[in-house]
Amino acid sequence: FAYTGSAFIATKEANADQGYKQGIVDGDASGIVYTNLFTGVHGNYLRSSIENAGLDPENLPTSDPSKMNFGSGGNTKAKAWKDIWGSGQGVGAVKSVGTVEDMVARMEAEYHDARASLGQKSSYRIWEA
């Protein structure tokens, strides 16, 4: 089981700001900041979007979780999702803005390559559906 979200933000079909898409492409796991400042719930955000909002990612205050507001920016002028962009640690695997079709084809090819590699390195038989 796996899930992906950030990779789909950086597609031509996504209705996301071009800066957000480029932030996904340029980002990696070290550029993710985990904080509850922007909504009251801890989440992962692109460091570059926090810096672009004039905030210091290393010195963010903690938000009061009893005051959750998913449309706010915490006690900042920046707004979550509009100015402060969420992202997962998988951003390092996104190398360019492309189509959903190309991304899914690449993921499928990577899956088959990994599966074949596991079969060669293991005495276990790969289950066939």
Give short role names for the model-derived ranges.
Residues F1-A129:
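Conserved active-site-proximal phosphate/metal-binding subdomains
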